[in-house]
C-alpha cells in the first residue's frame, strides 16, 4: 500500500498508531528510493559537459599516450632550443625593454582601475557570499534597534500577556462591537452566548409569533444545557425572559411588567371597576332570574290588592256554571250551541232510547258517558268533551263563530300514545331495514367500485364507502388485494384507507397492514403511508467471521430469529423493504480483540453505499502492547428512509496493530444481531 498523505489535520486531532505506521511507511519508501537513486550510474540528473566545466571539449576520441609521445618527439614539427634562441635573438634589447616596460605599465593601469571599481566587475551574487535570504533594503542601526527594544508602547509586558491570555475567548458581538443580526429562520433557543438582533417574525420561538417589530436578544449559557434568554422589543420597549432548563427543556416566555404597563393595567382595572353598564354582558339567567320579566315591580300594597282581586275572581269562577253538574239525562240535542255550560251524565238506556242524540256522539262509543260543555263569554268558540265511561276514552270537538261543531277527536291516553309510538317506530325500522341497509348505503359493488388506484379522487362518491380490491390488482394499491374505505367530504377533504386481507396461513404477515393516503383536487393523491402492520426482522450470525484489516467488512448475518414479513435475504445478508417509509435499524457485534491499538467502526449501508455511522470503538495504543484478550463491542441504532426494493446491510471497518486476525465471535442473538423495525410514514424527498 503506497504512502497516503493526510491533509485535513485539526488542532485537537490525536496521533494514533495508524498515523505513526503511515509515517514509518513513508520514511521507508523514501530511503528505498534514495538508495536506488544513489546507485543509478546513468546520469540520473542529466548533467551536461558545460555544467562540469568541459563545454569546449568535443565528444571525439583522444590521443593515446603512445601517440602523444610520438608527437612530442617529432623534431620536424617542433623547434629545438637552439632554433628558439636564434629566433629570439632577432629582437634588440632596446626593443624588448620597451615592450616589457609598456606591458608592465598597461598591467599596472589595468590592475589599479579594476581594483578601484565598485560595480561588482566579477558579478558576485548575494547567494555566493551566503546572503541569499537577505533583502536589498536599509538595515536599522544599533541605536534604532535599542530604541525600538525599549519602546513599551509597541511591546507587551509579561503581565499584559498573562492578562490577555486569561481573557474570555468567546466573541459575544460582531467584529464592529454591534449586535449580531440573525439569519431568517434561526431558532433562538439554539443560539450560544452573545448579543443578537432580528425582526421578530423572521426567527423561530420569538416571544410574539409573527411580530414585525425589531427585537434584541441577550443570551448567556450555563452548564447541562441551561441558558438564560432576555428578549427586548425595540418599538414597544417591552421585555421577556425565557429559561432553558437542564438538558434543553424550554420553560416558556415570561413578560416582564414595566411601570407603564402596570399603570396602564391599573387604570383599566379602575375604569372596569367603576363601569356600571354591565361590561361582562351578564344575563338574568346567569343570576338566577331567567323567568323574571323586565317590567316594573309591584309595590307590596299593590301586589296584595291584585292578589285579593285574583282570589275573588277564582271564587267567582269556581262558583260559576263551568263546573256545575247538570241533571242526569237532561239534554236531547248535544249540537245545540245554546246549551248551558256544565257536566251532563248520559246513561246507556237513555242513549238507546234517543237514537238521534246517540248518533251525535262518537260512533261505537256512544252508550254512556260524561258530556262537558265549557263556557264561552262571546260565543267565539264553544268546546265540548265526551268521556266514554265504558272505554275510558276522551273525545273533544269545537264550534267556532256560531258554526256547527266539528267532528270528534280522540284525546289519546298514555297507553294508547305509547302503543302508537311503538307501532310507528316498528314501522320505521322495518322500512329502513328493508330499503336502507348498511350494505346498500356504504358497500360499493359493480361499476361503482373503483378498482384503479390511479383514478381521480373527484370521481368517488361522497360519504363513507367500502370497496373490495380483487386479487392481482397492480394499479397502485399497497397490496394486490384487500379492501378500501373512503371517507369523502368534498374534493378537498378526502381520505382513503387500504386494508390487507390479513391472510397469515403461510406464516407470513405480509398481507397484514393498513395504509392511508389523501386527495386534494388541485394536487392529486399523496403517496401511501403505512399506519399499522409494521414488519420486524431480528437476525443473528453463525460461527466466527474473520475480519480483514484496513477494510470495511460486510457482516454475514444469516440466522433468522424473527422475520415477520419474510423480507430478510440470508444469502446476501440484507433486509429488503417491501414498502416506502422510515425504518429503525439496529446492529451489534462482539469482536475478538487484544490489548493493542484497535479501531472498529460500525456502518449501515443502503443499496451498497455507506449511509450512516452507527458506533465506533477505538482503543489507543496501550503502554504495554500484548496479545492478551480484550474483546470489543460495537452497537448502534439509526433511522433509515427506504423506498420499496431498497436494501440495508451492516459493515464494520477494522483497524488494529499487530498480526493477530480479528474475528466476529460465534455468539448468540444477545450480542450479534441485526434488527430492523418498520416505522411507517413516508420516505420524504431530500432537500
From Swiss-Prot:
SUPFAM superfamilies, per the entry: TNF-like (SSF49842)
Domain of life: Bacteria
The protein's name in its UniProt record: Phage-like element PBSX protein XkdV
Species classification: Bacteria, Bacillati, Bacillota, Bacilli, Bacillales
Membership in a protein family: To B.subtilis YqcC.
Amino acid at each position: 500500500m503506497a504512502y497516503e498523505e493526510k491533509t485535513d489535520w485539526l488542532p485537537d486531532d490525536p496521533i494514533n498508531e495508524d498515523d505513526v505506521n503511515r509515517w514509518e511507511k513513508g520514511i521507508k519508501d523514501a530511503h528505498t528510493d534514495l538508495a536506488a537513486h544513489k546507485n543509478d550510474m546513468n546520469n540520473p540528473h542529466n548533467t551536461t559537459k558545460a555544467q562540469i566545466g568541459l563545454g569546449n571539449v568535443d565528444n571525439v576520441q583522444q590521443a593515446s599516450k603512445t601517440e602523444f609521445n610520438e608527437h612530442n618527439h617529432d623534431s620536424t614539427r617542433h623547434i629545438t632550443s637552439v632554433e628558439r634562441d636564434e629566433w629570439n635573438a632577432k629582437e634588440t634589447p632596446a626593443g624588448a625593454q620597451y615592450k616589457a616596460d609598456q606591458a608592465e605599465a598597461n598591467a599596472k593601469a589595468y590592475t589599479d582601475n579594476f581594483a578601484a571599481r565598485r560595480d561588482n566587475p566579477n558579478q558576485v551574487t548575494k547567494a555566493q557570499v551566503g546572503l541569499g535570504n537577505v533583502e536589498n533594503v536599509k538595515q536599522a542601526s544599533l541605536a534604532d534597534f535599542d530604541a525600538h527594544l525599549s519602546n513599551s508602547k509597541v511591546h507587551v509586558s509579561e503581565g499584559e500577556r498573562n492578562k490577555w491570555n486569561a481573557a474570555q475567548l468567546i466573541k459575544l458581538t460582531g467584529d464592529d462591537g454591534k449586535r449580531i443580526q440573525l439569519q431568517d429562520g434561526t431558532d433562538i433557543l439554539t443560539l450560544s452566548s452573545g448579543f443578537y438582533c432580528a425582526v421578530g417574525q423572521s426567527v423561530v420561538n420569538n416571544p410574539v409569533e409573527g411580530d414585525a417589530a425589531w427585537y434584541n436578544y441577550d443570551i448567556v449559557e450555563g452548564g447541562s444545557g441551561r441558558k438564560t434568554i432576555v428578549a427586548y422589543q425595540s418599538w414597544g420597549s417591552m421585555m421577556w425572559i425565557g429559561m432553558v432548563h437542564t438538558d434543553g427543556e424550554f420553560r416558556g416566555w415570561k413578560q416582564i411588567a414595566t411601570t407603564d404597563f402596570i399603570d396602564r393595567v391599573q387604570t383599566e382595572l379602575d375604569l372596569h371597576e367603576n363601569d356600571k353598564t354591565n361590561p361582562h354582558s351578564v344575563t338574568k339567567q346567569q343570576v338566577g332570574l331567567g323567568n323574571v320579566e323586565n317590567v316594573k315591580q309591584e309595590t307590596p300594597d299593590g301586589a296584595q290588592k291584585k292578589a285579593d282581586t285574583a282570589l275573588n275572581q277564582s271564587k267567582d269562577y269556581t262558583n260559576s256554571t263551568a263546573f256545575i253538574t247538570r241533571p242526569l239525562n237532561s239534554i236531547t240535542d248535544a249540537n245545540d250551541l245554546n246549551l248551558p255550560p256544565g257536566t251532563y251524565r248520559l246513561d246507556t238506556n237513555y242513549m238507546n232510547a234517543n237514537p238521534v242524540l246517540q248518533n251525535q256522539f262518537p260512533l261505537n262509543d256512544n252508550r254512556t258517558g260524561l258530556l262537558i260543555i265549557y263556557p264561552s263569554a262571546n260565543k267565539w268558540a264553544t268546546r265540548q268533551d265526551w268521556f266514554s265511561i265504558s272505554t275510558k276514552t276522551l273525545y273533544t270537538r269545537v264550534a267556532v263563530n256560531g258554526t256547527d261543531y266539528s267532528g270528534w277527536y280522540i284525546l289519546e291516553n298514555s297507553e294508547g300514545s305509547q302503543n302508537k309510538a311503538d307501532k310507528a317506530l316498528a314501522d320505521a325500522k322495518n322500512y329502513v331495514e328493508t330499503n336502507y341497509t348498511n350494505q346498500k348505503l356504504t358497500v360499493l359493488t359493480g361499476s361503482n367500485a373503483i378498482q384503479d388506484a390511479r383514478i381521480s379522487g373527484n370521481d368517488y362518491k361522497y360519504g363513507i364507502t367500502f370497496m373490495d380490491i380483487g386479487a392481482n390488482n397492480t394499479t397502485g394499491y399497497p397490496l394486490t388485494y384487500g379492501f378500501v374505505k373512503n371517507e369523502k367530504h368534498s374534493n378537498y377533504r378526502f381520505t382513503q384507507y387500504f386494508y390487507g386481507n390479513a391472510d397469515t396461513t403461510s406464516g407470513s404477515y405480509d398481507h397484514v397492514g393498513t395504509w392511508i393516503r389523501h386527495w386534494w383536487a388541485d394536487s392529486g393523491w399523496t403517496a401511501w403511508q403505512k399506519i399499522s402492520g409494521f414488519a420486524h426482522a431480528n437476525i443473528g450470525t453463525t460461527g466466527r467471521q474473520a475480519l480483514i484489516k484496513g477494510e470495511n467488512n460486510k457482516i454475514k448475518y444469516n440466522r433468522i430469529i424473527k422475520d415477520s414479513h419474510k423480507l430478510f435475504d440470508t444469502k446476501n445478508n440484507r433486509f429488503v423493504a417491501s414498502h416506502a417509509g422510515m425504518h429503525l435499524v439496529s446492529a451489534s457485534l462482539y469482536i475478538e480483540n487484544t490489548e493493542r491499538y484497535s479501531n472498529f467502526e460500525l456502518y449501515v449501508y443502503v443499496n451498497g453505499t455507506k449511509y450512516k455511522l452507527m458506533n465506533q470503538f477505538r482503543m489507543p495504543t496501550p503502554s504495554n502492547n500484548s496479545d492478551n484478550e480484550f474483546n470489543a463491542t460495537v452497537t448502534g441504532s439509526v433511522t433509515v428512509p427506504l423506498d420499496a426494493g431498497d436494501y440495508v446491510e451492516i459493515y464494520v471497518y477494522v483497524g488494529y496493530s499487530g498480526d493477530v486476525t480479528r474475528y466476529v465471535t460465534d455468539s448468540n442473538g444477545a450480542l450479534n444481531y441485526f434488527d430492523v423495525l418498520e416505522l411507517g410514514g413516508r420516505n420524504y424527498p431530500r432537500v
